[in-house]
Amino acid sequence: MSQPADINQSESSAETITQGRRADRPEETPSSSVYEQNLRFGDFLMPTVGDADATDSLSQSTNDRDIYSPREIDQYTRKVSSRTDPSTSTISNARQHPRNSVSRLSRSSSNVRQQRDIPKQNFKVRPLSPLRGQSPASLRSEESFTLKERQNAINKTRAFGMRLWKPALYKKFRSINRDADIDIHDEPLKRPNTSISNVIWLICFGAPLFLVIFICYIFFTVLSFFNVPDAIVYSKLCRGLMFYLLYPFGQHVRHKVKRLSVRSPAHPIYQTQHSHYDETPTSHHPDPARLNFLSFSFCVNPMNQSLDCNTTPHRRNASSIIYTLMYYLIIAPTLLITSAICMFTIFFVPCARTLWAICRHLRTCPLSLSFRPNLALPLSMDSSDVVLLCVKKAASWKYYKYTIDGIYIIYFDMLALIIPTIFFGFFGSQGHWFTSSVFLFTASLVSIIPLAYFIGMAVASISAQSSMGMGAFINAFFGSVIEVFLYSVALRKGNAGLVEGSVIGSILAGLLLMPGLSMCAGAIRKKFQFFNIKSAGATSTMLLFAVLGAFAPTMLFRIYGPFRLDCEPCGANCQKCTKHYVLENDSLYKNRVLPFTYCCSIMLVLAYAIGLWFTLRTHASHIWQNFTADDISFLKAEEEVGEPVNQDTAGNMSDSSEGGEAVVNGNSQHHHNRDDASSGLSSNGSENESLEHEPTNELPQRPLVNQSQNSHGDDAPNWSRSKSAIILLSATFLYSLIAEILVEHVDTVLDKFAISEKFLGLTLFALVPNTTEFMNAISFALNENIALSMEIGSAYALQVCLLQIPCLMGYSLFQYYRSGDSISFKHLFTMVFPTWDMICVMICVFLLTYVHSEGKSNYFKGSILVLAYLVSMLGFTFFNY
């Protein structure tokens, strides 16, 4: 099996359009070139240099070449060819240039969006043969699963104490990333779209960039009058650059390529090009490096190979030195700042990537670049230029789904707010708007969202790559440590009401708001969804015990505790009295209730430990070791089809739609759009011995992950364990600093807006840190997996009751005895809640239990849960004593 070609990532490399392939040995050279393979399968992929996901995707496309039979390839080729409309494609515009081989590109260029219709077979896992020192049972353990399968297994089984996570933890080439590559490597023959985003670019970004580069152009023009060597060359470069940056749509960037010899069949460009010009390559062949862009720019770009920037001589003279200074002082900072601004706007991703690519090439090989309008095409056969970049639109709404290293771009953009907030919060001087309490409070609250997401991603990544015991421990510790630290800081500042409201608000959000919104969101795609009633029953049992343990001290104190009557006259012979429970200087609370709260806290932690023990010792073998081939096929079918697959032993549970490959389940075959070019099949040499492609729909044996770890695909994580650990610790440290700033300015905000600290805890402090959980729950529901959505809310409510409340009691106990029994109750978490809080939580648990008992969700039930949450919040608003 051929291996991916080494991509030259040196300074002389350019922005690539597609990934080439190279055979390891002459005898392993494929019979047909990768150009033809990509052409036939419609894999119109345009990765950037160093983009691992893109390299993985193209590597998989070549693996698919070996899976499909010649008959299937021929059928798909005819199918795609029949869809090409000569009246709308660019082929009719270039038929007058037959040497350009445009007709061969019809299936790659005009059918880019149709590449998802590729038929794909489903395979079954064959029994693993035991290796030396290993039993068949050990081979079926968790080490034999890819990371994708392990994540799906964790989500499907919903093991107690494990982190449920919707975004892919493995390397996955997403359709939005492929579209982003296409948008900056579009067909120069197509006319640009006249859109409002292009006008916004012209006014907001193009004009300022034009003025900055115009200064450099004037300077080099003046130098050219004094006959400074190469000044006129740099002047032309700046002139083309400033007009391109003013309005890049309808123009393209060219790059000169050094002429290469094609006499050697071992040359990478020769290997990927020769079969498309002549059946028998000869020395009369034209130089592939000099062919115009229409022959290879959209499939095999020579920039992907070792692009030589010495085509244009680069002499060290006064002009080059001046240009270098201008580049680092003026051009590069301007382009990079503008690129960052475009990236922060989320929707201007094509412009941001274009500016980044131009900035790189202006540093390495500026004189090899040229900027031309699209009317200058096609290129002549003797031209050594190739098309590097071609952008048709400045922005698109779809880029809110764009990912960087597996993280959505919106979370990366929000990271830019963290460091300034910490700096202004600790070192900023008063008197400025950016050091005001309102600004720092708002900025700190927003900064919590990306930090919580990164912590959740790191915890899920470590859990999926480690044993279940380690994953459960990491989730239990870091899943609650950030909230516990925030609450501890608030208690130290004397905001016990804020902590009390945050705890109640988190429970209500997990029991009502999160499942309610998930049901309403899931009804958008499917009116009814079903889940396993037995699994939901176990969760309901845990919730009932958690509520009993958390609110038992409150019930006993309300029944047996003393109270105080505060009366005021209402007339001549009447008084209006209000009953208040006071904990200070109360002997019943000190001698009876307080020890009882410590016992309840121990019981809550013990219940969590028993649940983990049951999961690790009982469910672990069921989840990992006893997974049969049918279970794995069921997981794949659920994940690839994106719909629940009927199976007697699996209940009504279905997994998320991570991908969209068509599968074969039983005797019925379902074809769906293909979202993702990655697959579980790998091409490592160590796997070839255990892989068998047979027409009996059997999946080749997958090797042990720890023995043959792929560098891409389902086996390769987005974050390694060491990287996840570093991110986890760093995000936790930053979260602690943000929590200090947030609590420091709470009192000022409360005084300015006249709201109670408990209501602030019920709303902002309870909802904002849980934004990641809401995102995961709604994403699962949209992918027709409402069971996981409801499990996320219940699991978080259990974590609050079973872990966070005992931790707060432990912190209060430490503060109570350290202060010598003289500390105020404003600095303690008493575990004695108001009566309305207790009644609300209990009713909500019974309401959710009733919804669980039916095993069916729809927008009606979701709306009822959301309305119940709103009623509870209104009660806290109008009767918050």
Swiss-Prot record:
Region annotation Disordered: where it falls in the sequence: 1-39, 52-142, 641-717
Q: According to the lineage, what is the superkingdom?
A: Eukaryota
Pfam families per the UniProt record, alphabetical:
Na_Ca_ex (PF01699), YccF (PF03733)
Q: Which residues cross the membrane?
A: 200-220, 329-349, 407-427, 438-458, 471-491, 504-524, 537-557, 594-614, 726-746, 762-782, 794-814, 828-848, 859-879
Composition bias, Low complexity? 99-113, 678-688
Please give the coiled-coil regions recorded for this protein. Answer: none
Q: Name one GO cellular component term.
A: endoplasmic reticulum
Modified positions (Phosphoserine) in chain numbering? S129
Single GO biological process annotation from the record: intracellular calcium ion homeostasis
Q: Where is the composition biased (Basic and acidic residues)?
A: 63-77
Query: Where does the record say this protein resides?
Result: Endoplasmic reticulum membrane
From the Swiss-Prot or TrEMBL record, what is one GO molecular function term?
calcium:proton antiporter activity
Q: What keywords sit in the KW lines?
A: Endoplasmic reticulum, Ion transport, Membrane, Phosphoprotein, Transmembrane, Transmembrane helix, Transport
Question: How does this protein sit in the membrane?
Answer: Multi-pass membrane protein
InterPro entries named among the record's database cross-references: CaH_exchang (IPR004713), NaCa_Exmemb (IPR004837), NCX_ion-bd_dom_sf (IPR044880), YccF (IPR005185)
What segments bear the compositional bias annotation Polar residues? 1-19, 83-95, 646-657
Say where the protein is mainly found: endoplasmic reticulum
Task: Name the family.
Answer: Belongs to the Ca(2+):cation antiporter (CaCA) (TC 2.A.19) family.
Annotated function: Putative cation exchanger.
Protein name according to UniProt: Putative cation exchanger C521.04c
Where does this protein come from, organism-wise? Schizosaccharomyces pombe (strain 972 / ATCC 24843) (Fission yeast)
